[in-house]
Design a protein with these regions (language model features):
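Soluble periplasmic/extracytoplasmic beta-strand elements of cell-envelope proteins
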Residues: 82-84, 111-112, 177
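Short, flexible loop segments at the rims of nucleotide/cofactor-binding pockets, characterized by
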Residues: 58-63, 115-119, 197
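Alpha-helical cap/lid subdomain in secreted, periplasmic
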Residues: 5, 16, 102-109, 118, ...
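N-terminal secretory targeting modules
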Residues: 1-86, 91-97, 134, 261-267
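Hydrophobic residues at beta-strand termini and immediately following loops
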Residues: 86, 113, 220-222
Length: 267
């Protein structure tokens, strides 16, 4: 009797276990497969935009600025003496103040090759395509203030003078008359205050005047005609103390015209 009770109890236990395993999906004798957890799919990030080339790395001297105009420029007309103005923003500013002159003045073949912010080493690099290759009779060079401001890095005054001399001598070697213009007065730089440029300007101008006389070049002294008691440009001639207004260019124009005439008259 006791044996029958034990068998019945064991049977009930087996049935209960079978029910439990069936309920949780376990089938005896069948290996269970593991199911990995679902990993959410993350969209690939959008490609980064292509970096914008730094022009100071790809074209430091800005040779492309006047390339197309240089190529398209016809040779000087017969009997007309071409003059190229090489410089920085002050030369570029001539565009609205007489260089190039009004189209009606066909007797003046004046070509403006000023680029704002440039220093003398940049100008020296582009001197051949922007000056020599244009076959001018005269080049007017106005440069150096941005060297003193450190626009392209620290420079000594001797380095500035060397670059000015190199441009002048390159021109002379190609039969181009040279007009060297004094650096304009500057008491301070609004974009780099505290550099005290006034005495440095005077030092380069003193060298330039002597160098021009020694080599037979023309020296145009804008500085003496425009400087104020501080050694800078007065507010009547400049809003920022560096770039001349129309009133400033009105003083400069007859001076540079006289310099060009003197250069053309020289043997």
């Amino acid at each position: 009797m006791n044996g029958l009770r034990r068998k019945a109890a064991m049977l009930r236990t087996s049935v209960g276990l079978a029910a439990i395993t069936a309920a949780i999906g376990i089938i005896p004798g069948v290996a269970q497969q593991s199911h990995p957890a679902t990993v959410p799919v993350t969209a690939a990030p959008a490609p980064a935009p292509a970096p914008v080339p730094d022009p100071m790395r790809t074209d430091w001297a800005n040779l492309k600025r006047f390339h197309d105009e240089d190529v398209a420029l016809a040779a000087p007309a017969a009997g007309v003496k071409r003059v190229v103005f090489m410089g920085d923003s002050i030369t570029q500013g001539w565009v609205h103040n007489g260089v190039p002159p009004e189209p009606a003045d066909a007797a003046k073949d004046w070509v403006n090759r000023g680029i704002s912010g440039q220093t003398t080493p940049q100008m020296l690099i582009r001197f051949r395509p922007d000056v020599i290759d244009l076959k001018p009779s005269v080049v007017v060079i106005l440069a150096g203030i941005n060297d003193i401001a450190g626009n392209t890095g620290p420079m000594t005054l001797e380095e500035t003078e060397g670059n000015l001399a190199s441009m002048a001598e390159l021109a002379a070697a190609h039969g181009i008359k040279v007009v060297m213009c004094s650096i304009m007065p500057a008491f301070d730089f609004p974009w780099r205050p505290g550099l005290e440029p006034a005495p440095k300007v005077i030092a380069v101008n003193t060298w330039m005047k002597a160098y021009a006389a020694e080599h037979g070049f023309v020296y145009v002294d804008y500085h003496s005609a425009m400087v104020d008691s501080r050694g800078g440009l007065p507010k009547t001639l400049s809003n920022d103390g560096v770039h001349p207004l129309k009133a400033g260019y009105a003083i400069m124009l007859p001076l540079v015209e006289a310099g060009i005439a003197k250069a053309l008259a020289a043997n």
